Amino acid sequence: VRIDIWSDIVCPFCYIGGRHLQLALERFDHAEEVEVVWRSFELDPRPVEDPHADLTEQLAAKYGMSRDQAEANQQRVGEAMEAVGLEFNWRDAHPANTFDAHRLAHLAAERGLSDQAQTAFKKAYFTDGRAIGDHQVLRDLAIGIGLDADEVDDVLSSDRYADQVRADESQAQVYGITAVPTFVLADQYSVSGAQPVDTLVDVLDQVWSLTEKTPLVPVSGAAGESCGVDGCD
């Protein structure tokens, strides 16, 4: 079973949802037969005017709430992260454009380092307060998970993997995905939001039962003559 996850690096519930899925897979009997594919989604594709701006203040303005309300929301998100072993130092977080991070995530996926990239980028943003749109920060993180420095430089100095990012976003539009995280299982079953671990375990069991290939059951007792790879009889 393949699970495609539409996610953005700066989405806190994507971070939580990814952790919930990891915990759910630890309880799923067929986890070794699950392939997780991270897909790109930009919550705000616009260029960041001030990468050092106060994220909480920006969120307050965006959603028409007071500073106190925005801080309370950030605190609740931080508590939700803490409950699953993640850390959100929201006072140190700043706005970021994630397009280049997504491009590097596609490189990482090609090199078998997809999960490592997702974890490194999200931890850098949420826990360490690093500027995830900055090329030097991205370079350090990408090399840190084992990507080749020259290849990382080539990506950051070009538009390599831009088409793959846009293709993911176009597919999200086809599916009608407007919020993340969104999990698409076996190309036809979707789950939206950072669902509880128990819910994800149930979903995995249900999708497995619907897609599992079972042996054919003969409807007659006698076998007629036939040909196989070793000849006819």
Regions found by a protein language model. Name each.
Residues 1, 50-51, 64-68, 141-146, ...:
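A broad, low-specificity signal for short, low-complexity segments enriched in glycine/proline
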Residues 12-13, 96, 191:
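Glycine-/small-residue-rich active-site loops that bind phosphorylated ligands and cofactors
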Residues 18-125, 227, 232:
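Structural alpha/beta surface segment adjacent to cysteine/selenocysteine redox centers
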Residues 1-12, 17-21, 36-39:
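Short active-site neighborhood of thiol/selenol oxidoreductases, capturing the structured segment around
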Residues 10-13, 66, 70, 161, ...:
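Residue-level preference for long, well-ordered alpha-helices that form the structural scaffold
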Residues 5-6, 16-30, 106, 110-233:
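C-terminal cap of thioredoxin/glutaredoxin-like
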